[in-house]
Structures are given as C-alpha cells and as structure tokens.
C-alpha cells in the first residue's frame, strides 16, 4: 500500500496537477475537511476507479482542509476533529495518489482576500438560512480547489444534498467543465448516516440521533401506503425527531434538483432533515418512493 504524496503548499499542488493534466492524465478529486470515515473513503475509491477509466492510470487526489470561511462565529471550527496521520493512512488504503493538506489556512485565504462565490438560489433556505455565509465559504473554497487541481471529475456525498446542489449550480454557471458525481449516503449498520461530527455524540445522544434515519424510513413507508401530502409527511418526521429529544432545525420536502419545497411528494422527492442532539447538529436526507 503506497502512501500518497502529501503536499502542503497550494502552489506546489497546482504545479503538480497542471503537469499531470498537460501530460494527458485524467484527474479525479475528492475534497474533504478530514477526520475521514467510510463515507469519504467510498468517494475516494470511486475517484480511483474514475481516474483510471480512460484506459491508463489516472491521478486520484484528495484535499484535507478545515475551511474557516464556512464556519459561523458560534460554530465548531476550533474543536472540529482532526487526525492528519490517520487520514493519510486511510487515503492510502483508498488508493489516492496525492493529498493536499494546506499547512496554514492563510495559504488558502491570505489576509486581504476579498473574492467570494455566491450561488444565489441553491444557497437559500435550509442550511443557508440556519448557517448564514456557510455556502459562500463552501462555494469559494471548492472553486479555488477546482482551479488549483483542474480535475476532470469531482465526487461529493449526497448526505450534504444542498451543498451538492450549490456545487452543481456553480460548475454549470461558471463553466468549470468538471463532471460532478454525487455518491450515496453511507450508514452505520443501525442506520445512522456517517459524519465526522458523530464523534461529538454521547452514547445516549447517538441512540437518540437514530430518529433521523427512523423518520426517513417512516416517511418512505407512509408514501408507499399512499400518503403524498407534504404537510402530513413533514409533521410525521418532525414528531419522530422531537419524540427522541431532537431540537429540530428544519424538516422539508423538496424537488431533488431545484430544492423548491413541494406540496405533494412525488417519486424522487427528497426529505431533508436537520436536528441537534445535545450540542451536535446533524443532517440527513432520503428520496421518497
């Protein structure tokens, strides 16, 4: 198992990726904030496969950067879990060739940085309402990583459904020419969606957080029985979360592409959930049948 090349300087990373692309190498990218779990690794394994899809070995790469610009002033930037050594071992097992892990946030956002990417419609509501400025930070750092890496394909998890919509809109509107691939949510055997923030949960909070996947399962069962009224489905999901002691941020049924709220759940409608258990805010989602 080969250890991936670790690059800590974005300029050196850009030179490395530019040389590879100019040599005709296909590049696949996975962006992360580190503290990797099986959800991230599923993206990296798929990046390896897609990088090599052209008939020759490509370049499968990842980034590890806890982006300060996507955290609000009261959020968990300082305590966000970090384990670079462990992450690199996982990247090696997943088959990555190289990893960018900037040694200083100022290398990505220098003093005087004044350029931001705002995706208007997709950033509104949901996490955009609960976390002002979050998607501006996400879109800006992803745009910068795209410019530094110039990948042919980039992979993102569907657990962050709104984030995926934001990135797809940005790539479309700014003509990045990158294929964006959304990958399914990876769950624990008991249904909890994998998240780096699960590390914050106490055993009791983790048990109660299973209400997220439980609410999704109940909504699927209800629609399978013929319930299509969005208000009724929202009410059922909210009740499940509140019964488990969750502090509900939002429960919404939306069109899978536009994120527009719907009055009636059609096949493929997405149920989006956000709730806190203890001090840990978690999100989850699922398509309805």
Swiss-Prot record:
**Which residues make up the binding site for beta-alanine?**
70
The alphabetized UniProt keywords are: ATP-binding, Cytoplasm, Ligase, Nucleotide-binding, Pantothenate biosynthesis
Positions binding ATP in this chain are: 33-40, 157-160, 186, 194-197
The family database entries (CDD domains) matched by this protein are listed as: PanC
Which reaction equation describes what this protein catalyses?
(R)-pantoate + beta-alanine + ATP = (R)-pantothenate + AMP + diphosphate + H(+)
Q: A GO biological process this protein is involved in?
A: pantothenate biosynthetic process
- The residues that hold (R)-pantoate are 70, 163
Query: What pathway annotation does it carry?
Result: Cofactor biosynthesis; (R)-pantothenate biosynthesis; (R)-pantothenate from (R)-pantoate and beta-alanine: step 1/1
Show the GO MF annotations: ATP binding; pantoate-beta-alanine ligase activity
Q: Which domain of life is it from?
A: Bacteria
What InterPro entries does the database record attribute to this sequence?
A: Pantoate_ligase, Pantoate_ligase_C, Rossmann-like_a/b/a_fold
Pfam families assigned: Pantoate_ligase
What SUPFAM superfamilies does the annotation carry? Nucleotidylyl transferase
Instruction: Give the UniProt subcellular location, in the record's own words.
Output: Cytoplasm
Q: What is its main location?
A: cytoplasm
One GO cellular component assignment for this chain's record is: cytosol
Write the Enzyme Commission number(s) for this entry. 6.3.2.1
Q: Where is the active site?
A: 40
The entry's other comment says:
The reaction proceeds by a bi uni uni bi ping pong mechanism.
Q: What does the record give as the function of this protein?
A: Catalyzes the condensation of pantoate with beta-alanine in an ATP-dependent reaction via a pantoyl-adenylate intermediate.
On assembly, the entry states:
Homodimer.
Family membership noted in the UniProt record = Belongs to the pantothenate synthetase family.
The protein depicted here goes by the name Pantothenate synthetase
Give me the gene this protein comes from: panC
């Amino acid at each position: 198992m080969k250890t991936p090349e670790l690059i800590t300087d974005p300029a050196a990373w850009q030179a490395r990726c530019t040389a590879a692309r100019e040599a005709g190498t296909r590049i696949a990218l996975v962006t992360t904030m580190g503290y990797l779990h099986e959800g991230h690794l599923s993206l990296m394994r798929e990046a390896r496969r897609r990088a090599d899809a052209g008939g020759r070995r490509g370049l499968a790469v990842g980034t590890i950067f806890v982006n300060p610009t996507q955290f609000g002033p009261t959020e968990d930037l300082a305590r966000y879990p970090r384990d670079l050594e462990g992450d690199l071992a996982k990247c090696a097992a997943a088959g990555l060739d190289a990893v960018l892990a900037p040694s200083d946030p100022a290398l990505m956002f220098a003093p005087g940085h004044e350029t931001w990417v705002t995706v208007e419609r997709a950033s509104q509501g949901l996490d955009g309402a609960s976390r002002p400025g979050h998607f501006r930070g996400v879109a800006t750092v992803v745009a910068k990583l795209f410019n530094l890496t110039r990948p042919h394909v980039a992979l993102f998890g569907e657990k962050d459904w709104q984030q995926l919509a934001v990135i797809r809109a940005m790539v479309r509107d700014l003509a990045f020419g990158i294929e964006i691939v959304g990958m399914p949510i990876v769950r624990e055997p008991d249904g909890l969606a994998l998240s780096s923030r699960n590390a914050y949960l106490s055993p009791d909070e983790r048990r109660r957080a299973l209400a997220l996947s439980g609410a999704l399962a109940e909504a699927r069962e209800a629609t399978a029985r013929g319930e299509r009224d969005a208000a009724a489905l929202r009410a059922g999901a909210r009740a499940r979360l509140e019964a488990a002691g969750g502090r509900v941020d939002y429960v919404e049924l939306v069109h899978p592409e536009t994120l527009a709220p719907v009055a009636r759940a059609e096949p493929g409608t997405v149920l989006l959930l956000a709730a806190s258990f203890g001090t840990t805010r978690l999100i989850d989602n699922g398509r309805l049948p």
